[in-house]
Amino acid sequence: SEMCIRDSSYAEYLQLMQQPAGRASYLAYLQKGGLPELYNLPTVESEKQYVASVKDTILLRDIVKRKPVRDVRLLDDIFIYLVNNASNLFSVQHIVNFFKSKNRKVSYDTLSNYLGYIEEAFLAYKTERYNIKGKDVVAGNCKYYLNDLSFKNFLYPGFAYGVGYLLENAVYLELRRLGYIVYTGSFRDKEVDFVAMKDDRVIYLQATYMLETAQTMEREYAPLLTIGDNYEKYVVSMDEVQFPSNEGVRHIQAWNLKEIL
Protein backbone atom coordinates (compact mmCIF):
# COMPACT_ATOMS: atom_id res chain seq x y z
CA SER A 1 0.00 0.00 0.00
CA GLU A 2 1.19 3.49 -0.78
CA MET A 3 2.21 5.74 2.02
CA CYS A 4 0.68 9.17 2.18
CA ILE A 5 1.92 11.79 4.58
CA ARG A 6 -0.83 12.92 6.88
CA ASP A 7 0.40 16.32 7.85
CA SER A 8 -1.12 17.80 11.02
CA SER A 9 -2.23 21.39 11.04
CA TYR A 10 -1.21 23.72 13.85
CA ALA A 11 -4.71 23.41 15.32
CA GLU A 12 -4.39 19.61 15.40
CA TYR A 13 -0.93 19.91 16.90
CA LEU A 14 -2.34 22.02 19.75
CA GLN A 15 -5.04 19.44 20.38
CA LEU A 16 -2.62 16.51 20.37
CA MET A 17 -0.12 18.29 22.61
CA GLN A 18 -2.80 19.97 24.74
CA GLN A 19 -1.13 23.34 24.43
CA PRO A 20 -2.57 26.83 24.08
CA ALA A 21 -2.18 28.84 20.87
CA GLY A 22 0.68 31.31 20.98
CA ARG A 23 4.23 32.01 20.01
CA ALA A 24 5.87 29.22 22.03
CA SER A 25 3.62 26.45 20.72
CA TYR A 26 3.83 27.75 17.15
CA LEU A 27 7.62 27.74 17.31
CA ALA A 28 7.51 24.18 18.67
CA TYR A 29 5.19 23.19 15.81
CA LEU A 30 7.59 24.67 13.24
CA GLN A 31 10.45 22.75 14.78
CA LYS A 32 8.58 19.45 15.04
CA GLY A 33 6.63 19.44 11.81
CA GLY A 34 3.24 17.86 11.27
CA LEU A 35 3.86 14.11 11.46
CA PRO A 36 1.74 13.05 14.46
CA GLU A 37 3.88 9.93 15.05
CA LEU A 38 6.81 12.20 15.86
CA TYR A 39 5.08 13.72 18.86
CA ASN A 40 5.42 10.59 20.99
CA LEU A 41 8.98 9.58 20.19
CA PRO A 42 11.37 9.79 23.14
CA THR A 43 14.63 10.97 21.54
CA VAL A 44 15.86 13.12 18.67
CA GLU A 45 17.60 10.04 17.29
CA SER A 46 14.34 8.09 17.13
CA GLU A 47 12.66 11.11 15.52
CA LYS A 48 15.37 11.27 12.85
CA GLN A 49 15.02 7.56 12.15
CA TYR A 50 11.27 7.86 11.81
CA VAL A 51 11.45 10.80 9.37
CA ALA A 52 14.14 9.02 7.34
CA SER A 53 11.95 5.92 7.11
CA VAL A 54 8.98 8.00 5.90
CA LYS A 55 11.14 9.62 3.23
CA ASP A 56 12.66 6.32 2.11
CA THR A 57 9.31 4.55 2.01
CA ILE A 58 7.82 7.16 -0.29
CA LEU A 59 10.86 7.98 -2.42
CA LEU A 60 12.56 4.63 -2.68
CA ARG A 61 9.66 2.25 -2.40
CA ASP A 62 6.48 3.89 -3.69
CA ILE A 63 7.94 6.09 -6.45
CA VAL A 64 10.57 3.62 -7.65
CA LYS A 65 7.96 0.86 -7.72
CA ARG A 66 5.49 2.85 -9.80
CA LYS A 67 7.67 5.01 -12.03
CA PRO A 68 10.50 4.40 -14.50
CA VAL A 69 13.29 5.63 -12.22
CA ARG A 70 16.68 4.58 -13.57
CA ASP A 71 18.77 6.68 -11.22
CA VAL A 72 17.51 6.26 -7.66
CA ARG A 73 20.32 8.33 -6.21
CA LEU A 74 19.39 11.23 -8.47
CA LEU A 75 15.78 11.03 -7.26
CA ASP A 76 17.04 11.21 -3.68
CA ASP A 77 19.39 14.10 -4.48
CA ILE A 78 16.63 16.07 -6.20
CA PHE A 79 14.52 15.69 -3.09
CA ILE A 80 17.44 16.93 -0.94
CA TYR A 81 17.79 19.89 -3.32
CA LEU A 82 14.09 20.72 -2.87
CA VAL A 83 14.38 20.47 0.90
CA ASN A 84 17.29 22.89 0.95
CA ASN A 85 15.75 25.28 -1.56
CA ALA A 86 12.14 25.19 -0.44
CA SER A 87 10.54 28.63 -0.76
CA ASN A 88 13.28 29.88 -3.11
CA LEU A 89 12.49 30.82 -6.68
CA PHE A 90 14.22 28.58 -9.19
CA SER A 91 13.69 26.81 -12.51
CA VAL A 92 14.32 23.25 -13.68
CA GLN A 93 17.31 24.61 -15.61
CA HIS A 94 18.74 25.92 -12.32
CA ILE A 95 18.76 22.39 -10.92
CA VAL A 96 20.27 20.95 -14.11
CA ASN A 97 23.05 23.54 -13.81
CA PHE A 98 23.50 22.73 -10.12
CA PHE A 99 24.11 19.05 -10.89
CA LYS A 100 26.34 19.92 -13.85
CA SER A 101 28.48 22.03 -11.52
CA LYS A 102 28.93 18.87 -9.47
CA ASN A 103 29.99 16.97 -12.61
CA ARG A 104 26.76 15.02 -12.89
CA LYS A 105 25.21 14.70 -16.30
CA VAL A 106 21.49 15.16 -15.96
CA SER A 107 19.04 15.79 -18.78
CA TYR A 108 16.35 18.43 -18.46
CA ASP A 109 13.63 15.87 -19.22
CA THR A 110 14.76 13.34 -16.60
CA LEU A 111 14.96 16.05 -14.00
CA SER A 112 11.57 17.40 -14.94
CA ASN A 113 10.06 13.90 -14.73
CA TYR A 114 11.63 13.16 -11.34
CA LEU A 115 10.34 16.48 -9.96
CA GLY A 116 6.91 15.46 -11.20
CA TYR A 117 7.13 12.10 -9.41
CA ILE A 118 8.07 13.83 -6.15
CA GLU A 119 5.06 16.14 -6.54
CA GLU A 120 2.69 13.28 -7.38
CA ALA A 121 3.80 11.51 -4.21
CA PHE A 122 2.91 14.70 -2.26
CA LEU A 123 6.40 15.10 -0.82
CA ALA A 124 6.61 18.64 -2.17
CA TYR A 125 4.29 21.09 -3.90
CA LYS A 126 5.10 23.25 -6.88
CA THR A 127 3.88 26.83 -6.77
CA GLU A 128 3.61 28.77 -10.02
CA ARG A 129 4.43 32.45 -10.29
CA TYR A 130 1.49 34.78 -10.74
CA ASN A 131 1.80 38.22 -12.30
CA ILE A 132 -0.54 40.36 -10.18
CA LYS A 133 -0.68 43.26 -12.65
CA GLY A 134 -1.32 41.10 -15.71
CA LYS A 135 -3.41 38.56 -13.77
CA ASP A 136 -1.71 35.59 -15.39
CA VAL A 137 0.66 32.75 -14.58
CA VAL A 138 4.28 33.30 -15.58
CA ALA A 139 6.24 30.35 -16.97
CA GLY A 140 9.80 29.58 -15.87
CA ASN A 141 10.68 30.16 -12.24
CA CYS A 142 8.58 28.60 -9.52
CA LYS A 143 8.84 27.72 -5.84
CA TYR A 144 8.50 24.39 -4.09
CA TYR A 145 7.21 23.87 -0.57
CA LEU A 146 7.62 20.71 1.47
CA ASN A 147 4.64 18.65 2.55
CA ASP A 148 6.20 18.47 5.99
CA LEU A 149 8.75 20.59 7.84
CA SER A 150 10.24 17.59 9.60
CA PHE A 151 12.26 16.69 6.48
CA LYS A 152 14.19 19.90 6.86
CA ASN A 153 14.49 19.82 10.62
CA PHE A 154 15.43 16.20 11.15
CA LEU A 155 17.20 15.08 7.98
CA TYR A 156 19.23 18.05 6.78
CA PRO A 157 19.46 20.47 9.68
CA GLY A 158 23.01 21.58 8.90
CA PHE A 159 22.02 24.05 6.21
CA ALA A 160 21.45 27.65 7.17
CA TYR A 161 17.69 27.67 7.18
CA GLY A 162 16.04 30.35 9.23
CA VAL A 163 12.73 30.15 11.03
CA GLY A 164 11.40 32.56 8.40
CA TYR A 165 11.58 29.84 5.75
CA LEU A 166 9.83 27.35 8.01
CA LEU A 167 7.12 29.92 8.70
CA GLU A 168 6.65 30.59 4.98
CA ASN A 169 6.34 26.86 4.33
CA ALA A 170 3.85 26.44 7.19
CA VAL A 171 1.70 29.34 5.93
CA TYR A 172 1.69 27.75 2.48
CA LEU A 173 0.53 24.40 3.90
CA GLU A 174 -2.23 26.06 5.93
CA LEU A 175 -3.56 27.93 2.88
CA ARG A 176 -3.50 24.74 0.85
CA ARG A 177 -5.14 22.73 3.60
CA LEU A 178 -8.03 25.19 3.70
CA GLY A 179 -8.68 24.83 -0.02
CA TYR A 180 -6.89 27.84 -1.48
CA ILE A 181 -5.09 27.74 -4.81
CA VAL A 182 -1.74 29.29 -3.97
CA TYR A 183 0.69 31.16 -6.21
CA THR A 184 3.86 33.06 -5.54
CA GLY A 185 3.19 36.63 -6.66
CA SER A 186 5.15 39.21 -8.59
CA PHE A 187 4.14 42.83 -9.00
CA ARG A 188 6.36 45.01 -11.18
CA ASP A 189 9.80 44.35 -9.67
CA LYS A 190 8.53 43.20 -6.27
CA GLU A 191 7.85 39.72 -4.94
CA VAL A 192 4.78 38.79 -2.90
CA ASP A 193 5.08 35.51 -0.99
CA PHE A 194 1.54 34.31 -1.63
CA VAL A 195 -1.44 35.06 -3.80
CA ALA A 196 -4.16 32.79 -2.41
CA MET A 197 -7.44 32.27 -4.26
CA LYS A 198 -10.62 30.52 -3.23
CA ASP A 199 -13.96 31.11 -4.94
CA ASP A 200 -14.16 34.92 -5.32
CA ARG A 201 -11.67 35.60 -2.59
CA VAL A 202 -8.12 36.75 -3.30
CA ILE A 203 -5.64 37.32 -0.46
CA TYR A 204 -2.08 38.60 -0.71
CA LEU A 205 0.22 37.48 2.09
CA GLN A 206 3.78 38.12 3.14
CA ALA A 207 5.33 35.76 5.69
CA THR A 208 8.22 37.03 7.76
CA TYR A 209 9.70 35.82 11.03
CA MET A 210 9.77 39.15 12.90
CA LEU A 211 8.79 42.71 12.04
CA GLU A 212 10.80 44.18 14.89
CA THR A 213 12.73 46.79 12.88
CA ALA A 214 11.40 49.62 10.75
CA GLN A 215 13.53 48.29 7.87
CA THR A 216 11.90 44.87 7.99
CA MET A 217 8.46 46.44 8.14
CA GLU A 218 9.29 48.61 5.16
CA ARG A 219 10.55 45.61 3.18
CA GLU A 220 7.57 43.36 3.97
CA TYR A 221 4.83 45.96 3.60
CA ALA A 222 6.19 47.67 0.47
CA PRO A 223 5.15 45.04 -2.10
CA LEU A 224 1.63 44.88 -0.66
CA LEU A 225 1.28 48.66 -0.47
CA THR A 226 2.19 49.06 -4.14
CA ILE A 227 -0.63 46.76 -5.29
CA GLY A 228 -3.47 49.12 -6.04
CA ASP A 229 -6.44 46.76 -5.88
CA ASN A 230 -8.89 46.20 -3.04
CA TYR A 231 -8.17 42.57 -2.21
CA GLU A 232 -7.15 41.63 1.33
CA LYS A 233 -3.50 42.07 2.22
CA TYR A 234 -1.77 40.53 5.24
CA VAL A 235 1.68 40.30 6.72
CA VAL A 236 2.04 37.13 8.81
CA SER A 237 4.75 37.12 11.47
CA MET A 238 5.74 35.70 14.84
CA ASP A 239 5.90 38.98 16.72
CA GLU A 240 4.47 38.99 20.24
CA VAL A 241 2.95 42.37 19.43
CA GLN A 242 -0.05 42.83 17.16
CA PHE A 243 0.78 45.76 14.87
CA PRO A 244 -1.86 48.21 13.65
CA SER A 245 -3.10 48.26 10.07
CA ASN A 246 -0.97 50.18 7.59
CA GLU A 247 -2.94 51.68 4.67
CA GLY A 248 -5.12 48.58 4.45
CA VAL A 249 -2.31 46.08 5.00
CA ARG A 250 -3.11 44.12 8.14
CA HIS A 251 -0.77 42.26 10.46
CA ILE A 252 -1.62 38.80 11.73
CA GLN A 253 0.30 36.63 14.15
CA ALA A 254 1.03 33.20 12.67
CA TRP A 255 -0.83 31.32 15.41
CA ASN A 256 -4.02 33.27 14.59
CA LEU A 257 -3.78 32.81 10.82
CA LYS A 258 -6.65 30.34 10.56
CA GLU A 259 -9.09 32.92 11.98
CA ILE A 260 -8.84 35.09 8.87
CA LEU A 261 -8.96 32.25 6.36
Q: Where do the PLM segments sit?
A:
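Amphipathic alpha-helical "lid/sensor" segments that cap RecA-like P-loop NTPase cores
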Residues: 17-57, 68
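Hydrophobic/aromatic beta-strand patches that form the interior of the parallel beta-sheet core
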Residues: 145, 205, 234-236, 250-252
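Domain-level recognition of nuclease-like catalytic cores that cleave nucleotide substrates
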Residues: 239-261
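Short, charged, amphipathic alpha-helix that recurs within catalytic cores of restriction-modification
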Residues: 216-232
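Active-site ExK catalytic segment of metal-dependent nucleases
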Residues: 200-212, 220
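Nucleic-acid nuclease catalytic cores
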Residues: 187, 228-247
